[in-house]
Curated annotation (Swiss-Prot):
Keywords: ATP-binding, Cytoplasm, Disulfide bond, Nucleotide-binding, RNA-binding, Transferase, tRNA processing, tRNA-binding. HAMAP family: tRNA_thiouridyl_MnmA (MF_00144). One of its GO terms (molecular function) is tRNA-uridine 2-sulfurtransferase activity. The record marks H133, Q350 as: Interaction with tRNA. It comes from Shewanella baltica (strain OS195). ATP binds at G16, M17, S18, G19, G20, V21, D22, S23, M42, G132. Catalyzes the 2-thiolation of uridine at the wobble position (U34) of tRNA, leading to the formation of s(2)U34. The gene is mnmA. The keyword Cell wall biogenesis/degradation does not apply. This is tRNA-specific 2-thiouridylase MnmA.
């Protein structure tokens, strides 16, 4: 492997060490570039004493092994209180209101690039922080900093980082954003890092291996109700609207209906007032399709945002293909977005993230759907 010429001697970087391969290789690459590197392992969730759902202890062990191998110091910090107040309570409130939140986005906003950055600044005297996210940073000649999609289109994580400010991006390094995932694993293997073949973490960190319904039910009381067709026919019951999201197909328990065609059933709407789950047949059922949406709680990485009436791309969920759309501001906090073509399963509570080519501009929270 070719060595990288050190260019940043003396600059101190605190790497968020998760115990995974991406942060492991990030630390190695930054060392190769001449940075003074130290690791910081975050504990964001206080798991029950008698369960083994959370792999925090195993992850810490792996992070320590990698830091030992690289010869760098590993610090630990507990952000469980901040996580509960700023991420988990938001998660519960959104589900209670019938929406489908994305706690990973809130975790990045409140913990990884706020609490972590403040700790790295105030306690560890860092020049930069670094994370193993698949995004890129571009420093422009006018002094501005932009966030770009990761080189690996299948792993690009800019969708989860749209709430970062220009200042946060300028203080953050993303070494693996320039690489494909297979290259990251190859580097880890070549360097003898034990995380080289570690499985990627998936799902929500505080739920771990538990069933989602089981976990949510311990915090929010279930409210069973009817499942209806768009025509109002009752065809089953649900255990709680919070357990279902638009476009969901599995776990409805209504297969084999009489007088229905062979198309699978999908969640096409929720009637919160009546506590009714509305389902229709076919992945392109008219009630599942939206011609646009309103988006609020806007955040733009460079503070200014795209101009009114512009035609750009949006993602309404992770790994979705870019959706061409036109933006109109209804006020400074709300956008009306019209898609070029109807889109299925746009979900209130999820994030809409906007792009101009490679550049992640920012985004907001999907509020209302526009149909027809």
């Amino acid at each position: 492997m070719t060595s990288i010429e050190p260019t940043h001697t003396g600059k101190k970087v605190i790497v968020g060490m998760s115990g995974g391969v991406d942060s492991s290789v990030s630390a190695y690459l930054l060392m190769q570039q001449g940075y003074q590197v130290e690791g910081l392992f975050m504990k964001n969730w206080e798991e029950d004493d008698n369960n083994e759902y959370c792999a925090a202890a195993e992850d810490l062990k792996d992070a320590q092994a990698v830091c030992d191998k690289l010869g760098i110091k590993l610090h630990t910090v507990n952000f469980a209180a901040e996580y509960w107040d700023n991420v988990f309570e938001y998660f519960l409130a959104e589900y209670k209101a019938g929406r489908t939140p994305n706690p990973d986005i809130m975790c990045n906003k409140e913990i990884k690039f706020k609490a972590f950055l403040e700790f790295a600044d105030e306690i560890l005297d860092a020049d930069y922080i670094a994370m193993g996210h698949y995004v890129r940073r571009r420093d422009n000649t006018d002094g501005s900093t932009q966030m770009l999609r990761g080189v690996d289109g299948n792993k690009d994580q800019s969708y989860f980082l749209y709430t970062l400010s220009h200042e946060q991006v300028a203080r953050s390094l993303f070494p693996v954003g320039e690489l494909e995932k297979h290259e990251v694993r190859e580097i880890a293997k070549e360097m003898g890092l034990i995380t080289h073949d570690k499985k990627d973490s998936t799902g929500i960190c505080f739920i771990g291996e538990r069933k989602f319904t089981e976990f949510l039910g311990t915090y929010l009381p279930a409210q069973p109700g009817n499942i209806e067709t768009p025509e109002g026919e009752v065809i089953g019951t649900h255990q709680g609207l919070m357990y279902h999201t638009l476009g969901q197909r599995k776990g409805l328990g209504i297969g084999g209906m009489k007088n229905s065609n062979d198309d699978p059933w999908y969640v096409v709407d929720k009637d919160l007032e009546r506590n009714v789950l509305i389902v229709g047949q076919g992945g392109h059922h008219p009630r599942l399709m939206s011609t646009g949406m309103t988006v609020n709680q806007l955040h733009w990485v460079d503070r200014t945002g795209p101009i009114d009436g512009c035609h750009i791309a949006v993602k309404t969920r992770y790994r979705q293909q870019d959706v061409p759309c036109t933006l109109t501001y209804t006020d400074e906090h709300t956008l009306r977005v019209v898609f070029d073509e109807p889109v299925a399963a746009v979900t209130p509570g999820q994030s809409a993230v906007f792009y101009d080519g490679e550049v992640c501009l920012g985004g907001g929270i999907i509020d209302q759907l526009i149909r027809g």
